From Swiss-Prot:
Phosphorylated by RsbT. Dephosphorylated by RsbX. It comes from the Bacteria. Pfam families: STAS (PF01740). PANTHER family: RSBT ANTAGONIST PROTEIN RSBS, RSBT ANTAGONIST PROTEIN RSBS-RELATED. Residues 4-115 form the STAS domain. The modification Phosphoserine is found at residue 59. The gene is rsbS. Interacts with RsbRA, RsbRB in the stressosome. The stressosome probably also contains RsbRC and RsbRD. This is RsbT antagonist protein RsbS. Negative regulator of sigma-B activity. Non-phosphorylated RsbS binds to RsbT, preventing its association with RsbU. Requires any one of RsbRA, RsbRB, RsbRC or RsbRD to sequester RsbT. When RsbS and the RsbR paralog(s) are phosphorylated, they release RsbT, which can then bind and activate RsbU.
Amino acid sequence: MRHPKIPILKLYNCLLVSIQWELDDQTALTFQEDLLNKIYETGANGVVIDLTSVDMIDSFIAKVLGDVITMSKLMGAKVVLTGIQPAVAVTLIELGIALEEIETALDLEQGLETLKRELGE
């Protein structure tokens, strides 16, 4: 079965990701690899990940998302999560995904503003 790729768009020195469907394990792992490669290739120093269309995540997807955030930070890219639905927020907290140092915003527009502020632009 072919898994859909999540589009990663470059805007100035940032990457924009809008996840438009529920993730399965393979798609999440492919996204992790694709995003890290894109950060490396473009030298992006910021990433906005929009989860508005994601209503629910399981423990594996939550772990992959946490890993993506940590790995992006290790590569020098600040991450802002946007559009977190209530059930997703509950799952992330219940699973102990550390979000204390992660910037969040209600929507993509606020996420971009938050990222610009974080990057001092």
